[in-house]
Regions:
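Membrane transport/envelope proteins' first extracytoplasmic loop
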Residues: 1-253, 262, 419-420, 425-440, ...
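Interfacial "coupling" helices/loops that link adjacent transmembrane helices in transporter permeases
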Residues: 13, 21, 254-293, 607-647
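N-terminal Sec/SRP start-transfer signal
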Residues: 1-37, 289, 293, 369-410, ...
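C-terminal transmembrane helical bundles of large multi-pass transporters
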Residues: 570-669, 673-680, 693, 697, ...
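Short helix-loop junctions at transmembrane helix boundaries
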Residues: 301-336, 651-713
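Short cytosolic juxtamembrane segments of multi-pass membrane proteins
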Residues: 357-372, 622, 707-713
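Juxtamembrane segments of multi-pass membrane proteins
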Residues: 67, 76, 381-500, 504-507, ...
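Hydrophobic alpha-helical segments
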Residues: 225-240, 263-366
Length: 713
């Protein structure tokens, strides 16, 4: 047993260490606080979104695919469940509302606010369209002469990403929305003038389904960006948060190691005395673990609390581009993360305390024999630099720690800048690459003469089962030539397609029409400069590149907005403005995420560089005092202890830049690799100067601070 007097003295020693190393504890506190907050808010928030969406898809029976057929399907197929999806579009004042008849089995809608439809004078619309167009529940809308009351908002699994077309990256709720009405209302609105397709659920793959239902067109849900995009956009930030958390816990371990190494070094004589006096290991363990455990616990409590309050904000962060179903926090995961986040830092601390204090052994000073090594090269290096090189060689762990911390901070900063600049360039390129004003997708049986550039759009599968957009254009195309001289028979891919799939001029393209089980092979002879979409362009003046049974959508590109009141032959429209604003919407979301990551990176770089340089300075005090007494100037002392730090830091940041480029590519591909849209990672070298500048500026500030402290020794 330890008497009360000893306990009081131990408490005083603990408080003295807290006061002496208060800045180090502040650094540890900030890193643990940030780590816990990010883990709880981002990981739990994004995981909860993913779980809510997947549960919604399951409960409301998301499709496994869709198909179009010219035949009425009455028979029931084995292993396939079907439902006809009916929709019509109302276009007024540049805005389009796609109205669906309520579904009974597949892609059923969920009412997210208000109430469900009760009569044929009511309508449900999606929440984002409601907000973007400044509407409210109980407002009335007039569609095709029918007044309908908005009684609620709703969304279905196939339209969480509520975008007009798969050709755009993100939704634009100001100009496009969806709505649901009952069967009677739908009949009054559209009569027989509506579009339809079949949604199906099945465990069979798309080719097997195609053989059974014999459609004119078929596509599976894996290639439906309206379904997959929201899932990818939840998974990528979740995985990023998990990776970031793991790296931050590594930093926590490093900071605790630095602290315990420094304290145990100063406490070596006291530890030897305590052992001789008979203090058992448990008493010493409790004594030396007290201040760090207290710091970790407070940081965990505050970080966890703030993280919990931020979960809802994180969950709704992408709500402006996705019409989410009702989202619920995964409280089981939250509890597990809270327990794990506390356990991991305490375990790290316990292990380090045991390693540095309990396994303590008094090191005996051994006189090492000096072996003189002659080096002709070293003789030409000034003594101050030779001394620095010797210190680096003898303190390899210190230099390794410096490189790791600089690399980690550089990784965060470069990742943020690269992601922001890449998406910004993507938005700018959307404006320059899309020079048409509007595209009209026509309903083949009801085509009427529209003046514009005609082309056909095919959706065919590649070797990996990914749907590719194939445009059949004329050699006189002005909207799709992209500064190339087109010739009949050209097979052209975009630069984005080349970057994504590694294809180049001379390579073969293998495409499959799963509807008719037709295989097509083409040899690429040109690559255009388009970087925003991974499209294929086939040039044919007679429009014949595929078997006549292969399904295509005829379309017309216009130089001016279509303002003809007669739109009976138009299946859907896509404006240039929709394409551009879809990119701007995602840029807004990316900017919010980047602001958070950059803020974290700046706090970390200040905290880590301070901790690292302070650690290096404390380990150098004896040599600095000795060398100062021998007459070395302050400038020489700085060289002897901190030379080569700047070039090493610069090279490390460049290395982190190269890895960040890979990280951004992986991050973007995880969200949208299967989509036609493509965001190219920027080649802007100014990012290297910006990230280097930020870190070098902070590093210089702390070096000046240490220089002033060396003056006073």
């Amino acid at each position: 047993m330890v008497n009360q007097n000893i306990r009081r003295k131990f408490r005083k020693r603990t408080m003295r260490r807290l006061n002496t190393y208060k800045l180090k504890f502040l650094v540890i506190f900030l890193v643990v606080f940030a780590t816990t907050g990010i883990f709880i808010s981002f990981f739990v928030g994004t995981s909860s979104v993913l779980q809510s969406v997947e549960k919604f898809n399951s409960e409301y029976n998301v499709e496994d695919g869709i198909f179009i057929t010219n035949d009425d399907i009455d028979e029931k197929f084995k292993d396939i469940s079907l439902e006809q999806i009916k929709n019509g579009e109302v276009r007024e004042g540049g805005s389009t509302v796609r109205i669906f008849q309520s579904r009974k089995k597949i892609n059923k809608y969920q009412v997210t606010s208000g109430r469900d439809i009760q009569n044929d004078k009511e309508i449900l619309i999606d929440n984002n369209y409601l907000k973007a167009n400044k509407l409210a529940l109980n407002d009335e809308l007039t569609f095709n002469g029918e007044k309908l009351k908005i009684v609620g908002t709703a969304i279905s699994p196939d339209y969480i990403t509520t975008k007009n077309s798969n050709l755009v990256l993100q939704a634009n709720s100001e100009v496009f929305g969806i709505a649901f009405v009952n069967e009677e209302t739908f009949q009054r609105l559209f009569g027989n003038e509506f579009s339809s397709y079949y949604a199906y659920t099945s465990n069979l793959d798309v080719q097997e389904v195609s053989k059974i239902v014999k459609p004119t067109y078929i596509n599976d849900s894996q290639n439906n960006t309206r379904i997959q995009q929201v899932i990818g956009d939840a998974k990528a930030p979740r995985d990023l948060a998990l990776l970031l958390t793991c790296l931050l816990y590594l930093i926590v371990g490093v900071l605790l190691s630095v602290y315990h190494f420094e304290v145990s070094k100063k406490e070596s004589n006291n530890l030897a005395t305590f052992n001789k006096l008979g203090f058992n290991k448990w008493i010493l363990f409790k004594h030396y673990i007290a201040e760090t455990s207290l710091t970790l616990l407070i940081a965990w409590l505050i970080g966890g609390t703030i993280g919990i309050f931020l979960i809802e904000t994180i969950m709704q962060m992408n709500s402006q581009i996705y019409n989410y179903p009702i989202l619920k926090i995964d409280y089981t995961l939250l509890t597990e993360c809270l327990v794990f986040s506390l356990a991991i830092v305490l375990v790290i601390n316990f292990v380090l305390v045991y390693q540095f204090y309990i396994k303590f052994k008094k090191k005996k000073n051994k006189v090492k024999s000096i072996r003189k090594r002659s080096s002709k090269i070293m003789k030409f290096i000034p003594f101050t630099y030779r001394y620095r090189l010797k210190r680096i060689n003898r303190n390899k762990k210190e230099m390794a720690l410096f490189i790791v911390l600089i690399f980690f901070v550089g990784l965060l900063i470069n990742f943020s800048f690269l992601l922001k600049d890449s998406v910004t360039n993507y938005v700018d390129d959307l404006a320059s690459e899309n020079i048409f004003e509007e595209i009209l997708f026509l309903n083949p049986p009801n085509q009427h003469d529209i003046k514009g550039e005609e082309f056909k759009l095919y959706n065919l599968h590649d070797e990996d089962g990914i749907t590719q957009s194939v445009y059949v254009i004329g050699s006189d195309s002005k909207y799709y030539n992209y500064n190339l001289k087109l010739a009949d028979g050209d097979v052209i891919i975009t630069q984005a397609f080349s970057d994504k799939y590694g294809k180049k001029v001379g390579d073969k393209l293998l495409l499959k029409d799963v509807t008719n089980q037709k295989d097509y092979s083409f040899k690429i002879n040109k690559v255009n400069n388009v970087t925003t979409v991974s499209n294929i362009y086939l040039v044919s003046d007679n429009g014949e590149m595929f078997n006549h049974e292969t399904y295509s959508v005829p379309a017309v590109a216009l130089s001016n907005p279509y303002d003809n009141a007669n739109d009976s032959g138009i299946e859907a429209t896509l404006t240039r403005n929709e394409i551009i604003t879809s990119g701007k919407n995602i840029l807004d979301v990316i900017n919010k995420q980047i602001t958070l990551i950059l803020g974290l990176a700046i706090v970390l770089q200040v905290a880590l560089l301070y901790s690292l340089l302070e650690f290096s300075y404390q380990n150098s005090i004896k040599s600095i005092k000795t060398l100062k007494l021998e007459g070395y100037s302050l400038k020489e002392l700085m060289r002897m202890h901190f030379a080569f730090s700047f070039p090493i830091a610069v090279l490390t940041i460049i290395g982190s830049y190269l890895l960040s480029r890979i990280g951004v590519r992986v991050f973007l591909d995880q969200i949208m690799f299967d989509f036609v849209n493509f965001v190219r990672v920027t080649d802007n070298l100014n990012i290297i100067f910006a990230s280097n500048g930020m870190i070098i500026a902070v590093f210089t500030f702390f070096l000046i601070r240490i220089r002033s402290k060396m003056k006073c020794i």
